[in-house]
């Protein structure tokens, strides 16, 4: 069964209801009814006349609902009455269907104080409705409801009660029980609160412990990290200290080694200086000149071998001084004396040190006296404390000596003379060969016999003035060879080529040229006296011998390197009767201690220093000699194994000219001034070596065997 519906006209229903309940509104009633054939409630009418006007609008054929506001005089507020109108002509089915709608309609219209059921106008009484509103029976004002109430009152029973007498024990138990549970509840709540607090405290304590543990772990890590850093720093400091100590030790070792090296170098320098000083002292103190012996042996060998066998002194090989008794590949067949002698052990055959043999015993005293008188100057003694000798190494001294020797150069040679002069030389050479062959036949005891027979000669003027560099082995210019060869008799012509390389070792070019003019005549006279067997030949005038012509581009000949501090000028070997008393080079006996008395040697020093010629006269003599030269491009045997020309040799001499000139500038003051030095760009080809031991030990054995 369907219920009443308010949805279709809900706004109209509520608007009419609001008009009734609002005090400001004039309307005080509203009538609602169903739509035709449906249960939808709608507004039928509204007005301001109260219950009387409302009762006039009810219809007998419809079910209607009236809502009215009734004002009571005793009440301040109005009352609201809901009238349920069921007309007499309404079907019963409709009445039964709408009976259940009253409660929903009263609920929809809130504030209904009294519900009045009416089917006619007489049921709508204003006095009855007001009475009911005043005593509270307004609900029962309906006759139907009144009858129903009366029927209920008749059937009602007496009302019972639940009251009981209060029992103190029971009441106390009940109260105690309630208090107990309340206390238990409170205790439980307190316990739970304590447990919560304990859990919170435990959690806080755990957090604190965890934080403390983390802090301790962090501190421990930091401590270990600091310890590790300290260890690393200590290790680094130790490593740095070790490195510093190692560096100091290395520096100390290096300094020690450096000091040792410096000490060794200093000791080596002192040793070399002491050797130089010792050698200089020995050279300065010796009264004889060992090189004289070898020069005389060369002359003897060249004289014994003949002029055809003697190699020209200008047919040389560079780097090696000329020596007739040294067999060379480019020289002619050697003589018997030179073939039997052994070559020198050093590349400098003329350089000797402390063991220089004293070979004066191989010659008679007469020859020794003639050598001493013909020597230009004695050996200049140089103090071992001389700074130029003691503090300078051997190589520098040799170089300076070479520079001093080559500081002066001769003028260029004139063109060679006509070949007519060659014929003049052939006869003296043949005579010299015969005389030297006779010298081989002479016995050894005759050497010492001549010493007693030959008286010393008084103050014969020396040929040449020596210079401080006479110990150096050098080769003179062609005019020096002529100076040594021109005063000799016919027998000396055979060795003029050899004398060109050997007789001029101790003198420079300028010194020889200046002393040549004044010494030719006295030297010739003294040589004539020395050769008694050839007096007739010496009395006759003799043409000047032929001198080899140097190359056109050369200005001076090669200088052979001699020892330092030797100053004796080599005289020509006598080839007269004394040649028979001379022994062969292989048959010479052991030489005596000295060549001659040092007193006699010292007597010739002032004469040698005083006899110095002027430059113009020396140059004129040199020009006359050079005009007679015929041989083309001679060569000299030098310290090497190959030949070199005089131009190259001259360049080698000029290479050392500057330093030698500076060192020996003061020593050249007593000598004649030389031409200015000539410098060359080509380095020297002379093999300069340090002082060596005795270069001819095998020849000494040969001398002993000859005895």
UniProtKB/Swiss-Prot annotation:
Biased composition (Low complexity): 329-343
Modification sites for Phosphothreonine: 377, 381, 392, 549
Positions of post-translational Phosphoserine modification: 141-142, 241, 342, 383, 385, 391, 467, 659
Stored SMART domains: ADF
Compartments where found: Cytoplasm; Cell projection, Dendrite; Cytoplasm, Cell cortex; Cell junction
Record keywords: Acetylation, Actin-binding, Cell junction, Cell projection, Cytoplasm, Developmental protein, Differentiation, Neurogenesis, Phosphoprotein, Ubl conjugation
PROSITE patterns according to UniProt: ADF_H
GO CC terms of this entry: actin cytoskeleton; actin filament; asymmetric synapse; axonal growth cone; axonal spine; cell-cell junction; cortical actin cytoskeleton; cytoplasm
Post-translational modification: ISGylated.
UniProt function note: Actin cytoskeleton-organizing protein that plays a role in the formation of cell projections. Required for actin polymerization at immunological synapses (IS) and for the recruitment of the chemokine receptor CXCR4 to IS. Plays a role in dendritic spine morphogenesis and organization, including the localization of the dopamine receptor DRD1 to the dendritic spines. Involved in memory-related synaptic plasticity in the hippocampus.
PANTHER family noted in UniProt: CORTACTIN AND DREBRIN (PTHR10829), DREBRIN (PTHR10829:SF1)
Other comments on record: Drebrins are classified into two forms of the embryonic type (E1 and E2) and one form of the adult type (A). The time course of their appearance are different from each other. Their structures are closely related. Adult rat brain expresses only drebrin A while drebrin E1 or E2 is observed in immature animals.
Protein's UniProt name: Drebrin
């Amino acid at each position: 069964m369907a219920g009443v519906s308010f949805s279709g006209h809900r706004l109209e229903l509520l608007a009419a209801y609001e008009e009734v309940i609002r005090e400001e509104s004039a309307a005080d009633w509203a009538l609602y009814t169903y739509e035709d054939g449906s249960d939808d409630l709608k507004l039928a009418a509204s007005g301001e006349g109260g219950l009387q006007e409302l009762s006039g609008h009810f219809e007998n054929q419809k079910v209607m609902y009236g809502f009215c506001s009734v004002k009571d005089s005793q009440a301040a507020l109005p009352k609201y009455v809901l009238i349920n109108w069921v007309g007499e002509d309404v079907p019963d089915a409709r009445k039964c269907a709408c009976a259940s709608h009253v409660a929903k309609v009263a609920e929809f219209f809130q504030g209904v104080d009294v519900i009045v059921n009416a089917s006619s106008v007489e049921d709508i009484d204003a006095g009855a409705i007001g009475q009911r509103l005043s005593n509270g029976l307004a609900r029962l004002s309906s006759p139907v409801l009144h009858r129903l109430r009366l029927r209920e009152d008749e059937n009602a029973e007496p009302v019972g009660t639940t009251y009981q007498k209060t029992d103190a024990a029971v009441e106390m138990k009940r109260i105690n029980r309630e208090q107990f549970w309340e206390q238990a509840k409170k205790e439980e709540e307190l316990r739970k609160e304590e447990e919560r607090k304990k859990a919170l405290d435990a959690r806080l304590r755990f957090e604190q412990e965890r934080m403390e543990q983390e802090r301790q772990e962090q501190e421990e890590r930091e401590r270990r990290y600091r310890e590790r850093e300290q260890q690393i720093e200590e290790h680094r400091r130790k490593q740095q200290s070790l490195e510093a100590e190692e560096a100091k030790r290395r520096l100390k070792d290096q300094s020690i080694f450096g000091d040792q090296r410096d000490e060794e170098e200093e000791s080596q320098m002192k040793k070399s200086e002491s050797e130089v000083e010792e050698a200089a002292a020995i050279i300065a103190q010796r009264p004889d000149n060992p090189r004289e012996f070898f020069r005389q042996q060369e002359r003897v060998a060249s004289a014994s071998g003949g002029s055809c066998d003697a190699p020209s002194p200008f047919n040389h090989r560079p780097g090696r001084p000329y020596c007739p008794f040294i067999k060379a590949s480019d020289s002619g067949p050697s003589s018997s004396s030179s073939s039997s002698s052994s070559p020198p052990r050093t590349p400098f055959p003329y350089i000797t040190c402390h063991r220089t043999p004293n070979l004066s015993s191989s010659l008679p005293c007469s020859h020794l006296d003639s050598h001493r008188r013909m020597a230009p100057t004695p050996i200049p003694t140089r103090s071992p404390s001389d700074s130029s000798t003691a503090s300078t190494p051997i190589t520098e001294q040799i170089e300076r000596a070479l520079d001093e020797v080559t500081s002066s150069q001769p003028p260029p040679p004139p063109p060679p003379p006509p070949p007519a002069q060659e014929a003049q030389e052939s006869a003296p050479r043949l005579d010299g060969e015969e005389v030297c062959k006779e010298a081989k036949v002479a016995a050894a005891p005759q050497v010492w016999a001549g010493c007693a027979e030959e008286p010393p000669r008084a103050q014969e003027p020396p040929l040449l003035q020596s210079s401080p560099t006479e110990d150096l082995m050098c080769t003179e210019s062609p005019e020096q060879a002529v100076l040594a060869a021109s005063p000799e008799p016919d027998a000396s012509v055979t060795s003029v080529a050899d004398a060109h390389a050997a007789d001029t070792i101790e003198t420079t070019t300028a010194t020889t040229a200046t002393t040549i003019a004044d010494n030719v005549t006295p030297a010739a006279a003294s040589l004539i006296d020395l050769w008694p067997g050839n007096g007739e030949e010496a009395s006759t005038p003799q043409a000047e011998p032929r001198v080899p012509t140097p190359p056109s581009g050369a200005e001076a000949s090669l200088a052979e390197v001699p020892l330092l501090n030797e100053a004796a000028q080599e005289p020509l070997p006598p080839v007269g009767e004394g040649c028979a008393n001379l022994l062969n080079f292989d048959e010479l006996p052991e030489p005596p201690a000295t060549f001659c008395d040092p007193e006699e040697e010292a007597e010739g020093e002032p004469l040698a220093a005083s006899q110095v010629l002027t430059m113009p006269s020396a140059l004129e003599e040199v020009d006359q000699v050079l005009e007679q030269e015929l041989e083309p491009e001679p060569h000299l045997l030098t310290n090497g194994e190959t030949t070199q020309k005089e131009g190259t040799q001259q360049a080698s001499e000029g290479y050392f000219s500057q330093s030698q000139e500076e060192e020996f500038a003061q020593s050249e003051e007593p000598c004649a001034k030389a031409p200015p030095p000539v410098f060359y760009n080509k380095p020297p080809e002379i093999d300069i070596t340090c002082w060596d031991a005795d270069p001819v030990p095998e020849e000494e054995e040969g001398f002993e065997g000859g005895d």
